[in-house]
Amino acid sequence: VNVYSPALSKGTVTNAYGFYSLTLPPGEHTIVAQFIGYQKSEQQIKLQGDMTLNFKLAASSTELEEVEVSSTRADENVSSVEMSVARLDVKDVKKMPQLLGEVDIIRSLTLLPGISTVGEGSNGFNVRGGNTDQNLILLDEAPVYNSSHLFGFFSIFNADAVKDVKLYKGGIPAQYGGRLSSVVDVRQKEGNNQRFAATGGIGLLSSRLMLEGPIKKERASFMVAGRRSYADLFLGLLEDPDLNQNILFFYDLNTKINWRINERNSLFLSGYFGRDVFGINDFFSFDWGNATTSLRWNHVFNPKTFANFSLIFSDYTYSLG
């Protein structure tokens, strides 16, 4: 988000968490906050010392009669200093054709340049010739060791619970480590702190439900989302005893709590738990799943210094019988 003073032609840009620092001379100023796709917000202030100024932007849409597209020289067409970075809009992902109608975040990445799928019915992907195990996948900063359900047919990410997805194909920042090919940084929704809302869907293989709302308006909010497949229910309806005793299903749960304690401190607690269960009569069984928890504390020391403290837990378990 761009935050600036029009009169002084001086401004700054917020970071990923919405924090910014802007130094202005004492006096009366008009401060503007602006971002593409949102309504511009202006506030009048009388600056006498250090102060905190928060903005809340509302989404906007504009109907255009005509759009003219023109290009610029390659050396002038620089919109970001981040190279080899792609961002996915979850709204666009939901519009893409998907296998059996199930929205899949990971498979949608294979539509981007430099990324290829490892094959149909598989959830892995290759980035610029690298192997699938060279991709670091994060969910609210917690590493995910197995990002698929049903042996790779679907990803573990419930699109209703995802806020945004960022993919680093090269020039990976130093804060990420442990992989050679790419980093997929998935962030969950923080919950609506104004009103309660629900989103859900019924698909061919699974159903899902997401609830969000304020715990305390303007201060704390929550988001909880669940999903379960029901292939095992259909198998039980078959008359063949070799099939109706088989088990094949998955389920997952996403949660997040956001609490703005005061102007200087914010807490975020998020979690994920998912499980796959597969069994062939009494002959063979295979269960696996992920569990992650992230606790982040954002603290502003002064107008120019802030810090993020994170406590991360990630676990992958499986059993073979």
Regions found by a protein language model. Name each.
Residues D104, T110, S122, G152, ...:
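Transmembrane beta-barrel architecture of outer-membrane proteins
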Residues G203-R228, P241-V277, F286-F313:
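Transmembrane beta-barrel wall of Gram-negative outer-membrane proteins
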Residues G152-S155, K163-P173, S182-G213, S221-R228, ...:
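Short strand-turn segments of transmembrane beta-barrel domains in outer membranes
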